[in-house]
Swiss-Prot record:
Biased composition (Basic and acidic residues): 1-10
Pfam annotation, one family: CsbD
Annotated stretches, region: Disordered: 1-23
Gene3D superfamilies with a match to the protein in the record: YjbJ
Protein name (record): UPF0337 protein SAG0606
InterPro entries: CsbD (IPR008462), YjbJ_sf (IPR036629)
Family in the record: Belongs to the UPF0337 (CsbD) family.
Amino acid sequence: MSQEKLKSKVEQASGSLKEGAGKLTGDKELEAKGFVEKTIAKGKELADDAKDAVEEAVDVVKEKLK
């Protein structure tokens, strides 16, 4: 697992914890902040996955052109 992917997973977990704590305590602001943090981290993870897929595809094309 790449460093970026690991960081995204940690941020997702942190966001989930904040969101859950906000729900539990009735703190709508904390709940919203947690949701946003979790969602942004998931987006970063998906972008990293897409980057990896493109890099792999480029490598395959390069090998076929040799």
